[in-house]
Amino acid sequence: MTGREGGKKKPLKQPKKDGKEMDEEDMAFKQKQKEQQKAMEAAKQKAAKGGPLVTGGIKKSGKK
């Protein structure tokens, strides 16, 4: 094998795979993810309008 014959055997870009084939487990997982995302968004909105949870008052230095 000479130097010119060597090289990459695989093409740089792989053909795209069809991701449209999903079974029941995949569908259930996607649905669960959507529900968790909605719950997270609702929790973010609820937390954003609340304000600070705990105020420690005036912070004091360690010196006495």
From Swiss-Prot:
Parts forming coiled coils: 21-50
Keyword Cytoplasm: no
InterPro entries the UniProt entry points to: TMA7 (IPR015157)
Chain segments carrying region Disordered: 1-64
Stretches with biased composition (Basic and acidic residues): 27-44
Assigned keywords, A-Z: Coiled coil
Domain of life: Eukaryota
PANTHER family with a match to the protein in the record: TRANSLATION MACHINERY-ASSOCIATED PROTEIN 7 (PTHR28632)
Similarity comment: family membership: Belongs to the TMA7 family.
Protein name: Translation machinery-associated protein 7 homolog
